[in-house]
Amino acid sequence: CCDDSECSTSCWPCCY
């Protein structure tokens, strides 16, 4: 996962 400001919810594939 990533540690984005909006993708840091849990482990969403929006940062892949």
Curated annotation (Swiss-Prot):
Origin organism of this chain?
Answer: Conus textile (Cloth-of-gold cone)
One of the record's GO molecular function terms:
toxin activity
Domain of life according to the entry:
Eukaryota
Print the domain comment field: The cysteine framework is III (CC-C-C-CC).
Q: Where are the transmembrane segments?
A: none
GO terms under cellular component: extracellular region
Q: Which UniProt keywords apply?
A: Disulfide bond, Hydroxylation, Secreted, Toxin
Q: Where in the cell is it found?
A: Secreted
All disulfide bonds of the chain are C1-C15, C2-C11, C7-C14
Q: Describe, from its UniProt entry, the tissues in which this protein is expressed.
A: Expressed by the venom duct.
User: What is this protein identified as?
Assistant: Conotoxin tx3j
Q: What is the lineage of its organism?
A: Eukaryota, Metazoa, Spiralia, Lophotrochozoa, Mollusca
Q: Which residues carry this modification: 4-hydroxyproline?
A: P13
Residues of the signal sequence? none
Family that this chain belongs to: Belongs to the conotoxin M superfamily.
